[in-house]
């Protein structure tokens, strides 16, 4: 009989956690009794680095013949980092105060009201567009403005420096454009001489700053409307520096752009040129252009463009649109309106990325129902009646609607792909922005099987975004954000399948700008998208949830210690890392019990994996499995001491879990839990048997067992009982062992594990992995080719997992999340290597710290 680990440790003291795995010399008889194994050791030093004992990195036990019997390589794990004293040292002083709870409730109410009050979109005044509307002469023929309140607004809203625009943010392009529009309007109406002179002085002294700004900050249509207005200003006799080099350059750009414009394109179909008709008045056929008027009477939602058309045509629908906008805003107009689809989609995206969406489920549903009711297979724009779709709103809509279960097709992206396979924001546009390409990239990761357009979008946008990170001038065509670079870096490093909600929330809290602005024809703000309330709630909520998580982790540490598991010398102690898993995705306070069950079950899968994988003899493993099957504590007397600790802890823990499950489900669940574990232990046993005889199965045989032995299904099937839902047998079957959903979770988890660990485990004597088994089936291919094929299988399975997650609506939402997020956490843990075993010197350690111990400021 093999010695228990305590005796092995007394022979050769390693000072670290160790594990034996079967390792046979090729000349040995594979049928040698599993009860007569010899042990070899690999040591970990105090610096957690492997100690090498010669070329083989092993050392034989004294007094044993190295060729007489099958051997074991004794695998050692680095000790756990998150010991009690480490956790205690990191405990912040933060506690949830009653005032915090009250403030959270207040903010939730205010944000709910914000969502419920959403109409056509809230935004700020545009001095530029207001100046164009103020030009309109009265329709009654009097020599007065049709909208005198807009003229008065211009007179009252000049800034101290003589410019017009947003006071808190200086963008030379925006200020110069708005100021030029306002002084022209005041000159036309022969009023505000003082304001005009101050505006001219501002223009003269500040226009040159445009040369210092990035081209990407140039507002939409600037090269069209700015030269046209300069021509007007010159005709009005305004004393401006018309000969400045940059002005001449912009005029040349305009001429070149107009020369490239096909004569009939302007009238063939709606394009972004409709947004800037005020700058094209000398070439527009006003009768033809009316065919492209939007249903609401506007031209691409632009008050300035619509005002110019009205002054040329007297079209009543144009006037109705302008009256509609002024009825909403009073004495000014924004740069475009409505913005109803844009506002709703970005507001939903904001609360989701900040991690506060769980407070606004009804509001989110209402917002998305509205967007979906205006969804178009050709794409959508920023407003429901916008005739020109854009990839930014379309990609955001496709991703969010799909993830919330709405039936939307990825074919919608084909509208925005040119003949070279590149993606663009608007039809006929060649320049792209970082924010729109970022949204397409985020969208591309929620692909379903066979959606080649999504794969093409992913590759195209990844290439663009990586180049953008190297080019500071690429930030950004459509927005001035606090840290768009940080958003891009996060998206590329943690794409959808490894972006856990708590980590994304932490990152976005740091990157989110409550004063972010967007770039249209002028700079504009969206207060229902960017505001301090979202950020304040996100910080308070994150710290509050984190406080509860720390308390739960301490409870689980006490369970671990009281169960005697810290005495086990053969297994990995990764309590904090394992608790981090459910805390990173099922983080809401109401799921505390589910997190505890998930963590305890996961810890047992690690203990028993290490036990069955290498430590126990086959006889003892079969005894352990039989004890679980019979649920018989008396059999423990026949076990070695460390296995006694395992089984007693297992037996007591799952009796407690079953009792709690009975209360929640209203029926006995112990037999269900037993059966879940029986299947799991059968998979472990099969792997142990394969290892004992160095059997390399076929790929299909291996995956059939390995997708179970990865143990994710066991964790999910038991934890699901505590998601707050009554789970009928029918529901359980939809996430059960025979379900495609659960299989894909196990498959992707197994494959990402194998791709990152097979080389190290092969060096330690393991003979079966997805890569090795595939190579056995296909001896003609190289290891590199086999690895590439396994990655392809995994990527395809992740796409299918997306579809199962989205379409499996018969399964309660929390159960769907449990399955899907468990698959995602595996992608995170194994993104760069074995993030569980080697968590002490990998990024997982920082994730644990940021998620559980570091409050946000």
From Swiss-Prot:
Cofactor(s) this protein requires: Mg(2+)
Taxonomic lineage of the native organism: Eukaryota, Viridiplantae, Streptophyta, Embryophyta, Tracheophyta
Annotated EC: 4.2.3.32, 4.2.3.18, 4.2.3.132, 5.5.1.12
Residues of the transit peptide: 1-33
Cofactor binding comment, as recorded: Binds 3 Mg(2+) ions per subunit.
Record bears the keyword Lyase: yes
Family membership noted in the UniProt record: Belongs to the terpene synthase family. Tpsd subfamily.
Domain remarks: The Asp-Xaa-Asp-Asp (DXDD) motif is important for the catalytic activity in the class II active site relevant for the cyclization of GGPP. The Asp-Asp-Xaa-Xaa-Asp/Glu (DDXXD/E) motif is important for the catalytic activity in the class I active site, presumably through binding to Mg(2+).
Residues reported in the UniProt entry to bind Mg(2+) 2: 609, 613
Residues that hold Mg(2+) 4 according to the record: 390, 392
GO BP term (any one): defense response
Record-level GO cellular component terms: chloroplast
Stated role: Involved in defensive oleoresin formation in conifers in response to insect attack or other injury. Involved in diterpene (C20) olefins biosynthesis. Bifunctional enzyme that catalyzes two sequential cyclizations of geranylgeranyl diphosphate (GGPP) to levopimaradiene. Levopimaradiene is the major products of the enzyme with abietadiene and neoabietadiene. No activity with farnesyl diphosphate (FPP) as substrate.
Protein name: Bifunctional levopimaradiene synthase, chloroplastic
Pathway entry: Terpene metabolism; oleoresin biosynthesis
Residues binding Mg(2+) 3, per UniProt: 753, 757, 761
UniProt keyword annotations, A-Z: Chloroplast, Isomerase, Lyase, Magnesium, Metal-binding, Multifunctional enzyme, Plant defense, Plastid, Transit peptide
The gene coding this protein: TPS-LAS1
Stretches of the chain forming a coiled coil according to its record: none
Localisation: Plastid, Chloroplast
Lipid biosynthesis among keywords: no
Main location: plastid
Reactions this protein catalyses: (2E,6E,10E)-geranylgeranyl diphosphate = (+)-copalyl diphosphate; (+)-copalyl diphosphate = abieta-7,13-diene + diphosphate; (+)-copalyl diphosphate = abieta-8(14),12-diene + diphosphate; (+)-copalyl diphosphate = neoabietadiene + diphosphate
């Amino acid at each position: 009989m093999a010695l228990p680990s305590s005796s092995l440790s007394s022979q050769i003291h390693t000072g670290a956690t160790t594990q034996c795995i079967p390792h046979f010399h090729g000349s040995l008889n594979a049928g040698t009794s599993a009860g007569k194994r010899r042990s070899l050791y690999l040591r970990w030093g105090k610096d957690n680095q492997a100690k090498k004992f010669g070329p083989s990195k092993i050392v034989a036990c004294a007094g044993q013949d190295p060729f007489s019997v099958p051997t074991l390589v004794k695998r050692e794990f680095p000790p756990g980092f998150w010991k009690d004293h480490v956790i205690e040292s990191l405990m912040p002083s933060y506690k949830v105060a009653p005032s915090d709870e009250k403030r959270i409730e207040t903010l939730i109410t205010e944000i709910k009201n914000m969502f419920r009050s959403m109409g056509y979109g809230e935004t700020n005044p545009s001095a530029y567009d207001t100046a164009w509307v103020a030009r309109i002469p009265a329709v009654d023929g009097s020599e007065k403005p049709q909208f005198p309140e807009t003229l008065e607004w211009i007179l009252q809203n000049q800034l101290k420096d003589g410019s017009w625009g947003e006071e808190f943010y200086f963008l030379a392009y925006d200020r110069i454009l708005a100021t030029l529009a306002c002084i022209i309007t005041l000159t036309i109406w022969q009023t505000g001489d003082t304001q005009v002179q101050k505006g001219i002085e501002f223009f003269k002294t500040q226009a040159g700053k445009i040369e210092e700004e990035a081209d990407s900050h140039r507002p939409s249509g600037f090269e069209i409307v700015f030269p046209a207005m300069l021509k007007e200003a010159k005709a009005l006799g305004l004393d401006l520096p018309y000969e400045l080099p940059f002005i001449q350059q912009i005029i040349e750009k305009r001429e070149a752009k107009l020369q490239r414009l096909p004569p009939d394109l302007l009238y063939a179909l709606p394009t972004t040129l409709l947004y800037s008709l005020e700058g094209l008045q000398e070439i527009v056929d006003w009768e033809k252009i009316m065919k492209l008027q939007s249903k609401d009477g506007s031209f691409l939602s632009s008050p300035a463009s619509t005002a110019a058309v009205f002054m040329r045509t007297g079209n009543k629908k144009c006037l109705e649109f302008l009256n509609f906008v002024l009825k909403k805003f009073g004495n000014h107009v924004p740069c475009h309106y409505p913005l109803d689809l844009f506002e709703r989609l970005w507001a939903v995206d904001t609360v989701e990325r900040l991690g506060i969406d769980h407070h606004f489920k009804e509001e989110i549903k209402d917002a998305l129902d509205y967007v979906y009711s205006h969804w178009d297979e050709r794409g959508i724009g920023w407003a429901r009646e916008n005739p020109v779709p854009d990839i930014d709103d379309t990609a955001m809509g496709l991703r969010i609607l799909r993830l919330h279960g709405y039936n939307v097709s990825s074919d919608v992206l084909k509208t925005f792909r040119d003949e070279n396979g590149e993606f663009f924001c608007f039809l006929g546009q060649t320049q792209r922005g970082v924010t729109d390409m970022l949204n397409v990239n985020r969208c591309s990761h929620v692909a379903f099987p066979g959606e080649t357009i999504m794969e093409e979008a992913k590759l195209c946008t990844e290439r663009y975004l990586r180049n953008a990170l190297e080019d500071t001038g690429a930030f950004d065509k459509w927005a001035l954000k606090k840290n768009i670079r940080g958003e891009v870096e996060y998206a590329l490093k943690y794409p959808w399948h490894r972006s856990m909600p708590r980590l994304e929330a932490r990152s976005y809290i740091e990157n989110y700008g409550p004063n972010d602005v967007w770039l249209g024809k002028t700079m504009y703000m969206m207060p229902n998208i960017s505001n301090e309330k979202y950020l304040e709630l996100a910080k308070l909520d994150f710290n509050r949830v984190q406080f509860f998580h720390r308390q739960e982790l301490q409870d689980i540490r006490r369970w671990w210690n009281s169960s005697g598991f810290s005495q086990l010398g053969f297994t990995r102690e990764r309590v904090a890392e394992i608790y981090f898993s459910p805390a990173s995705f099922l983080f809401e306070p109401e799921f505390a019990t589910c997190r505890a069950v998930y963590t305890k079950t996961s810890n047992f899968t690690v203990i028993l994996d290490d036990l069955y994988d290498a430590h126990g003899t086959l006889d003892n493993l079969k005894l352990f499995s039989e004890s679980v099957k019979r649920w018989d504590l008396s059999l423990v007397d026949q076990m070695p001491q460390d296995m006694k600790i395992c089984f007693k802890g297992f037996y007591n823990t799952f009796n407690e879990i079953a009792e709690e499950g009975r209360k929640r489900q209203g029926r006995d669940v112990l037999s269900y839990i037993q059966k879940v574990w029986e299947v799991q232990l059968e998979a472990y046993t099969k792997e142990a048997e394969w290892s004992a005889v160095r059997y390399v199965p076929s790929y299909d045989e291996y995956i059939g067992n390995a997708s179970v032995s990865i143990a994710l299904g066991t964790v999910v099937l038991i934890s699901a009982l505590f998601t707050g839902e009554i789970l009928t047998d029918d529901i359980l079957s939809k996430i059960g062992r025979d379900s495609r959903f659960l299989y894909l979770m196990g498959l992707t988890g197994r494959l990402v594990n194998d791709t990152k660990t097979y080389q190290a485990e092969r060096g330690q004597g393991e003979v079966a992995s997805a890569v090795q088994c595939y190579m056995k089936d296909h001896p003609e291919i190289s290891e590199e080719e086999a690895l590439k094929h396994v990655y392809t299988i995994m990527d395809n399975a992740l796409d299918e997992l997306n579809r199962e997650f989205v379409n499996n609506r018969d399964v309660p939402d929390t159960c769907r999340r449990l399955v899907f997020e468990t698959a995602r956490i595996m992608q995170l843990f194994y993104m760069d290597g074995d993030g569980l075993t080697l968590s002490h010197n990998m990024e997982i350690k920082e994730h644990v710290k940021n998620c559980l111990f570091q409050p946000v400021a």
